[in-house]
Amino acid sequence: MMGFPNMVKEVRQRLKLSQKQLAQALSVSYTTINRWENSHVVPSNLAQKSFYDFCENNFIDVPSLLTDKEHTK
């Protein structure tokens, strides 16, 4: 199963966003996105919900993202 760090990176790449652009969209710092993607910190539940809401608002279904990624391995 895809972990949160890989999910953040996958969503960001699908939307063709830089870490800085994603950070602005989520109202967090660039450093925060970088730390999430590199597994240096675990985001709070609130931050994770914000990310999932962002995905939903951008028409990315997280469960299907997980399934799609598993099929490409």
Where are these regions (language model features)?
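Short amphipathic recognition helices of helix-turn-helix/homeodomain-type DNA-binding modules
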Residues: 63-73
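Short alpha-helical DNA-recognition segment
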Residues: 17-34
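A short, Lys/Arg-rich alpha-helix, primarily the initiator
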Residues: 1-14, 52, 62
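DNA major-groove recognition helix of helix-turn-helix/homeodomain DNA-binding modules
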Residues: 45-64
